[in-house]
From Swiss-Prot:
This is Putative membrane protein insertion efficiency factor. Keywords: Cell membrane, Membrane. The keyword Flavoprotein does not apply. Coiled coil: none annotated. The keyword Membrane applies. It is a peripheral membrane protein. GO terms for cellular component: plasma membrane. It is found in: Cell membrane. Could be involved in insertion of integral membrane proteins into the membrane. Belongs to the UPF0161 family.
Amino acid sequence: MCAPTSDDPFDIPEPKSIPAKTAASAVRFYQKYLSGLKMGSTCRFDPVCSTYALKAVSVHGAFKGTILSAARLSKCGPWHPGGFDPVPNHGFWSTETVT
């Protein structure tokens, strides 16, 4: 499931599995209907957390993508400076080697 992806954090591939498609649909629902209820942008990261979650579940699948997204959300707060934080192409669970 850890296919090579573009380095562009906004280049989001289409999820392949049904659980990943379901998770991606939940994120898109949040983006379309709930995110706009907040006043202005509140995310201190680039890409924003919902885009990160969408790419994480699309690239790594529902389970691993949810873990990555939860880890990202746990950084949300004044104790973390934020900044550029893209979805990793490979993680600790990957059996692929980076050359």
